[in-house]
Amino acid sequence: MEALVYVFLLTGTLMVIFFAIFFREPPRIAK
């Protein structure tokens, strides 16, 4: 059960960091 908690926290942290960097910088994909 603890493994699922660690995976959930790790995924959540990565998603938060990804969205923070993506929304902070202007998206270069959509011209």
Swiss-Prot record:
Which Pfam families does its entry note? PsbT
Query: Which Gene Ontology terms of cellular component type are present?
Result: chloroplast thylakoid membrane; photosystem II reaction center
| Topology relative to the membrane | Single-pass membrane protein
Keywords on record: Chloroplast, Membrane, Photosynthesis, Photosystem II, Plastid, Thylakoid, Transmembrane, Transmembrane helix
User: What stretches pass through the bilayer?
Assistant: 3-23
Its annotated compartments are: Plastid, Chloroplast thylakoid membrane
Q: Name one GO biological process term.
A: photosynthesis
Q: Which InterPro entries does the UniProt entry name for this protein?
A: PSII_PsbT, PSII_PsbT_sf
Functional summary from the UniProt entry: Found at the monomer-monomer interface of the photosystem II (PS II) dimer, plays a role in assembly and dimerization of PSII. PSII is a light-driven water plastoquinone oxidoreductase, using light energy to abstract electrons from H(2)O, generating a proton gradient subsequently used for ATP formation.
Please give the PANTHER family that the UniProt record associates with this protein: PHOTOSYSTEM II REACTION CENTER PROTEIN T, PTHR36411
Subunit and partners: PSII is composed of 1 copy each of membrane proteins PsbA, PsbB, PsbC, PsbD, PsbE, PsbF, PsbH, PsbI, PsbJ, PsbK, PsbL, PsbM, PsbT, PsbX, PsbY, PsbZ, Psb30/Ycf12, at least 3 peripheral proteins of the oxygen-evolving complex and a large number of cofactors. It forms dimeric complexes.
UniProt record similarity statement: Belongs to the PsbT family.
Q: By what name is this protein known?
A: Photosystem II reaction center protein T
Q: Which organism is it from?
A: Porphyra purpurea
Lineage, uppermost ranks: Eukaryota, Rhodophyta, Bangiophyceae, Bangiales, Bangiaceae
Gene that encodes the chain: psbT
